[in-house]
Design a protein with these regions (language model features):
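Glycine-rich, highly charged phosphate/nucleotide-binding loops
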Residues: 35-57, 67-71
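Extended catalytic core of nucleotide-activated donor transferases of GT-like folds
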Residues: 70-80
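Redox-cofactor binding/interface segments in oxidoreductases and associated redox assembly factors
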Residues: 62-63
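Active-site nucleotide/adenylate-binding loops and adjacent lid/helix of ATP-dependent enzymes
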Residues: 1-8, 15-20, 29, 40, ...
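Short, solvent-exposed loop/turn segments at secondary-structure junctions
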Residues: 10-11, 68
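Residue-level detector of functional hotspots within protein domains
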Residues: 13, 46-47, 71-73, 103
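N-terminal ordered "arm"
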Residues: 25-26, 31
Length: 132
């Protein structure tokens, strides 16, 4: 399989471990820095370019999207999905993990114990703190 790791840090330990594991399992591995990717839709076709070269040979992607790149990274994952490329993490999951409230709701719904958590407008701050 041709697999790309979407990561700004090719030299990061976690990225290197993924590259090594993929290569040891006979996959063709590469790292694509999302900040060097451009997206387009042309003639009804989704296209990703990396350093102005079309990326059309991937079977799967492993997103390693940092917090500073969340929304563009999620868009990039969706775009690859539209091209038929499998992703081990969905764009929705990336966005959910960056939203603390949504994450707390999901954990609570799955019966994972979480500490008492409160969200409210700043005009209710005194009331909220008194009930915490």
């Amino acid at each position: 399989m041709n697999i790309a790791i979407l990561s700004k840090g090719e030299t990061l330990y976690s990225t290197q471990v993924l590259l090594k594991a993929g290569t040891e399992n006979k996959h063709v591995m590469e790292v694509l820095d999302p900040s060097h990717c451009s997206l387009s839709i042309e003639n009804g076709r989704s296209i990703v370019k990396f350093h102005n070269e079309i990326v059309d040979d991937l079977d799967a992607i492993i997103p390693r999207i940092g917090a500073s790149n969340t929304y563009y990274g999620a868009t990039l994952v969706r775009h690859f999905n539209a091209m038929g490329v499998f992703s081990i993490v969905s764009a929705g999951a990336i966005l959910q993990t960056r939203d603390k409230w949504t994450c707390s709701q999901l954990l609570s719904k799955a019966n994972v114990p979480i500490p008492k958590t409160i969200l409210g407008a700043s005009s209710n701050l005194e009331y909220l703190l008194s009930n915490f």
